[in-house]
Every structure is written in structure tokens, then in C-alpha cells.
């Protein structure tokens, strides 16, 4: 949620920043609501002052034995009017809040201008894509041939965009998740969390999924619960309505959870394989930072994701999302894209974002400055560390052999009982 004072003070600046990210902003609606809110507050304060003055006069008249009935009637009318105005004020405040909840975050000044993913600048590349002596296959073909992925039975069980993992693929999925979590917890200082996989509407609103993106979510019929699209949602909201101590910052949580997405608007995209599923596993990183140091934390978080790919020996590149390609809650985002030889393309495997105080304002996440003073909003960050299914895709495609087998990266072998290679059953 944007700072109300910023909108009041610099509406043109906000409108320009949001236009840069392709979002139209009806400032006239906000201005009308805000002016009405302020007018109501001013009228209520004036009437309360009048009521207080009249109450004092009634007390004086009673002490003097004078007839205060006319003034008491006036007081009753003032109280009724104040109640009516208070009710209207709350309605207008709710309308302002609803308007604010639908407005995306403002891009940081360091974010490049652009209209689409075609305008995202590349930051760096790591690793050299392997030169194959044969035509590399896509992961779904290899995984099916080796008996590890079963899309046909998944379709029978649930429908399209689901997968059944068997034998080595199930074990590799678990191995990847454990490797990711172990690295984040033991080396990067994250606290491991197992959160609920269902959350309520307030929690979804806190991180920005609601109210705007309800069609992208799975809601439990008859319950006010949603399946989480990412562990960012429960991890960030662990501190909703909390006041942290500045000494606690920065702090980080990591979780491995299933994620559930409707993939609305993705019809026809990545219809085969594991790239775009309704249910997938992801290890998520969430950090809470001091406002003056949150962009340093973003660079650290990106590094925490990159080191996993480096240890797996998977080539990747990092891009900065331009203004027109950013997520709703983000002030700045890096995408990390892993090389998939079967597709002859880099595909996203991690997205690391600094949301500034945007989510903190929605969820009420504050910290108390070390030197005292009024609590301030913390900055929140989130990043994939990593998408487990896509990591499995990358391992299969990059480590495939001409005989159809797949070599297991050395870093995963301790998690897979020393297995070195996957061969046909």
C-alpha cells in the first residue's frame, strides 16, 4: 500500500511512476474521496468542540439553577449529527482504503523504464552452456523415458498442468529442496519455517495477492481460505501487526512448500512438462530489513539464490525487470533465468524482489528504532531459493547424456544415497 501522505503531497509524481509501469491511476476518484474524508473529519472536530463548549455551559446553568432544557436538546442533536458523520467518515475511509489496495507499488528510481519483458536488461551471465554432440531433448521426454515423470496418470488423477513424480525424480525433487534449505539455514542464516499451506483473506491482502488477483488463486469452497501461491504469503505475514526491534533487523525466513496457482491467462503456454503447473514445490526466502539497508539485502538475497545454481553447475543469467514487467508489490525485481538446452532458452527459476514498505503498510509490519521514537514501517523482501520443479528440469536437461541417462550433480549425490546416474529402469 502506498503512503497516503505521498499521494496527497505529490499526486503527479505517483501518477507518473505508475504510468511508467503501465498502470493507469484515477487520481480524480482518490482526490474526491480524500477531500470528502478531510472535510468530514474537520466538521466532526468542529462539532465536537461545539459540543464540549455546550456541555460546559449546561453544567454552569445547572449549578446556577437555570433551565438548561433547550441547550440539552441542542446537545442531543449535536451528538446525533456527530454519530452520523462518524459513520460516513468510516465509509469514506473504507473507500479510500479499497482504492489504495488496488494500486501497485512505485518502481524504485534504479529500475529501468520499459513496457514488456523484451525491455528487461541483462545484468550478468554465469557459466557456459554445454556444447552437446547430439540434439538435446526436453525434460518431459527424458523424465518419461526414464520412468520418473508420469503426466498421463497425473492427468487421470487431476487434469492438465499436474505431474506424478516417481522413483528417482521424486527423490531428486526432495534432494534439491533439502539442499536448498540446508544452504539457506546453515550458511545464509535463515530460520526454517513450515507454515500453513492455506491462509485467510487478510493474509493474502497483506502481501498484495488480494483484492486484485483473486482469479489467480485457488479458494476453498465454503471457507475463507486460499491455497498459498507462494510461501512469501505466510512468511511475510508472520509479523503482521507486529512491532519488531531494530536490533532484530535484518532477519530472514526460509520455507519449502507446495504452491498452488490457477495460471489464469496462461492458456496455451508451456502445456507440456513441469514449467507451468497448478501445483509445484518452491523454497522461498523472505527478509525483513531496515529501510536504509533494504537494497543491500536485495543484493544479498539474489546471491543466496545464485550460489545454489553455481553449486549445481547450471548456467544462468540475471535480468532486472523493467517498469512494465514488475510484479504488483515490487519496488525492484531481479529474475534469475537458468539455461535449458532442450528449449535452447533461459527460463525463470528465481525472482528476488524488494517491496519497500508496500507490504509492511498493508500488513502493519513495523520496527521500533534503536534510539527510541515512533515505530516505522520495515521493508520486506522475497525471493525464490529456488523453484524446485524448475531446478529438476534444469538438472535433467543440462546433465542428459547421449545414451538417455542423466548424470546427477555431485552436490546432490549425498542427498540421493550416493547415486551418480539415472538410467532406464
From Swiss-Prot:
L-serine binds at residues 230-232, 284, 384. It catalyses: tRNA(Ser) + L-serine + ATP = L-seryl-tRNA(Ser) + AMP + diphosphate + H(+); tRNA(Sec) + L-serine + ATP = L-seryl-tRNA(Sec) + AMP + diphosphate + H(+). Pathway: Aminoacyl-tRNA biosynthesis; selenocysteinyl-tRNA(Sec) biosynthesis; L-seryl-tRNA(Sec) from L-serine and tRNA(Sec): step 1/1. GO terms for molecular function: ATP binding; serine-tRNA ligase activity. Its EC number is 6.1.1.11. Gene3D superfamilies: Bira Bifunctional Protein, Domain 2, Serine-tRNA synthetase, tRNA binding domain. Consists of two distinct domains, a catalytic core and a N-terminal extension that is involved in tRNA binding. NCBIfam families: serS (TIGR00414). This is Serine--tRNA ligase. It comes from Nitratidesulfovibrio vulgaris (strain DSM 19637 / Miyazaki F). The gene is serS.
Amino acid at each position: 500500500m502506498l503512503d497516503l501522505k505521498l499521494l496527497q503531497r505529490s499526486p503527479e509524481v505517483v501518477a507518473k511512476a505508475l504510468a511508467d509501469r503501465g498502470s493507469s491511476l484515477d487520481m480524480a476518484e482518490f482526490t474526491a474521496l480524500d477531500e470528502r474524508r478531510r472535510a468530514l473529519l474537520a466538521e466532526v472536530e468542529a462539532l465536537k468542540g461545539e459540543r464540549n463548549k455546550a456541555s460546559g455551559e449546561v453544567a454552569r446553568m445547572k449549578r446556577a439553577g437555570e433551565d438548561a432544557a433547550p441547550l440539552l436538546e441542542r446537545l442531543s442533536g449535536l451528538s446525533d449529527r456527530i454519530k452520523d458523520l462518524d459513520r460516513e467518515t468510516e465509509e469514506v475511509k473504507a473507500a479510500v482504503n479499497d482504492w489504495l489496495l488496488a494500486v501497485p507499488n512505485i518502481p524504485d528510481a534504479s529500475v529501468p523504464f520499459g513496457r514488456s519483458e523484451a525491455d528487461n536488461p541483462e545484468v550478468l551471465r554465469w557459466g557456459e552452456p554445454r556444447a552437446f554432440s547430439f540434439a538435446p531433448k526436453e525434460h518431459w521426454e527424458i523424465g518419461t523415458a526414464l520412468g520418473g515423470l508420469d503426466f498421463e496418470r497425473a492427468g487421470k488423477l487431476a487434469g492438465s498442468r499436474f505431474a506424478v513424480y516417481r522413483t528417482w525424480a521424486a527423490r531428486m525433487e526432495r534432494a534439491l529442496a533439502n539442499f536448498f534449505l540446508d544452504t539457506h539455514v546453515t550458511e545464509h542464516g535463515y530460520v526454517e519455517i513450515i507454515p500453513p499451506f492455506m491462509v485467510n483473506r487478510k493474509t493474502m491482502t497483506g502481501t498484495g495477492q488480494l483484492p486484485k488477483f483473486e482469479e489467480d488463486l485457488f479458494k476453498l469452497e465454503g471457507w475463507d481460505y486460499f491455497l498459498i501461491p507462494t510461501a512469501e504469503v505466510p512468511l511475510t505475514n508472520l509479523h503482521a501487526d507486529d512491532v519488531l526491534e531494530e536490533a532484530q533487523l535484518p532477519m530472514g525466513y526460509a520455507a519449502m512448500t507446495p504452491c498452488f496457482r490457477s495460471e489464469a491467462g496462461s492458456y496455451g503456454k508451456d502445456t507440456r512438462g513441469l514449467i507451468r503447473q497448478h501445483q509445484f514445490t518452491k523454497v522461498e526466502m523472505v527478509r525483513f530489513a531496515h529501510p536504509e539497508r533494504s537494497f543491500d539485502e536485495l543484493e544479498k538475497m539474489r546471491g543466496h539464490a545464485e550460489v545454489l545454481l553455481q553449486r549445481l553447475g547450471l548456467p544462468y543469467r540475471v535480468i532486472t525487470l523493467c517498469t512494465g514487467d514488475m510484479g504488483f508489490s515490487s519496488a525492484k525485481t531481479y529474475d534469475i533465468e537458468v539455461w535449458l538446452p532442450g528449449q535452447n532458452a533461459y527460463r525463470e527459476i528465481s525472482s528476488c524482489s524488494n517491496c519497500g514498505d508496500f507490504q509492511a503498510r498493508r500488513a502493519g509490519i513495523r520496527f521500533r528504532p534503536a534510539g527510541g521514537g515512533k515505530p516505522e514501517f520495515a521493508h520486506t523482501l522475497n525471493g525464490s531459493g529456488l523453484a524446485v520443479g524448475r531446478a529438476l528440469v534444469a538438472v535433467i536437461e543440462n546433465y542428459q547424456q547421449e545414451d538417455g541417462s542423466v548424470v546427477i550433480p555431485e552436490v546432490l549425490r549425498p542427498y540421493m544415497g550416493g547415486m551418480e546416474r539415472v538410467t532406464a529402469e
